[in-house]
C-alpha cells in the first residue's frame, strides 16, 4: 500500500517585474497634477496602496500631496459628474385623480 511518490514540477515562467509607477525623477508634490491624478479614482477617491503598487512611504507622500491639493482647490474633494447629468425623462401620463375625503 505504498503510494508512489509524485513529483510536482512547477513550470518555469519568466517573471517580469513591473516598473514602479513613480520614477526616481518624479517629485511627489501637490503642484504635480499629472502625477497625482494617476492615483485618484474617477470618483475622486485616493486609490489604495495595493492598487497603486507603491511603497508605504510613497503612498503616504501621495496621500499628503492629494490632501494638500484638495485644500488649495487644485483638486475637487468629490467628482460627481454623473450627478449633474440629467437622465432622459419619461413622459408623465395624466391619469384620473381621486381625492379621498
From Swiss-Prot:
One Gene Ontology cellular component annotation? chloroplast
What the entry lists under Pfam families is as follows: Ribosomal_S18
Where does this one sit in the cell?
Plastid, Chloroplast
Q: Which residues form a coiled coil?
A: none
Q: Which UniProt keywords apply?
A: Chloroplast, Plastid, Ribonucleoprotein, Ribosomal protein, RNA-binding, rRNA-binding
Q: Name one GO molecular function term.
A: small ribosomal subunit rRNA binding
| Primary localisation category | plastid
Q: Which BP terms from GO are recorded? A: translation
Q: Does the keyword Repeat apply?
A: no
Q: Which domain of life is it from?
A: Eukaryota
The ranges of region (Disordered) come to: 82-101
Q: By its UniProt entry, which HAMAP family does this protein fall under?
A: Ribosomal_bS18
Question: Record's PANTHER family?
Answer: 30S RIBOSOMAL PROTEIN S18, SMALL RIBOSOMAL SUBUNIT PROTEIN BS18M
- Give the protein family: Belongs to the bacterial ribosomal protein bS18 family.
- Assembly mode: Part of the 30S ribosomal subunit.
NCBIfam families to which the protein is assigned, alphabetical: S18
Q: What is this protein called?
A: Small ribosomal subunit protein bS18c
Species of origin: Platanus occidentalis (Sycamore)
What high-level taxonomic lineage is stated for the organism?
Answer: Eukaryota, Viridiplantae, Streptophyta, Embryophyta, Tracheophyta
Amino acid at each position: 500500500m505504498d503510494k508512489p511518490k509524485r513529483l510536482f514540477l512547477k513550470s518555469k515562467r519568466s517573471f517580469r517585474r513591473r516598473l514602479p509607477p513613480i520614477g526616481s525623477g518624479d517629485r511627489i508634490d501637490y503642484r504635480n497634477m499629472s502625477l497625482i491624478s494617476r492615483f485618484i479614482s474617477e470618483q475622486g477617491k485616493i486609490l489604495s496602496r495595493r492598487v497603486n503598487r507603491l511603497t508605504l512611504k510613497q503612498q503616504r507622500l501621495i496621500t499628503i500631496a492629494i490632501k494638500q491639493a484638495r485644500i488649495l482647490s487644485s483638486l475637487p474633494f468629490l467628482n460627481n459628474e454623473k450627478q449633474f447629468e440629467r437622465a432622459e425623462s419619461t413622459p408623465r401620463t395624466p391619469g384620473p385623480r381621486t381625492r379621498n375625503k
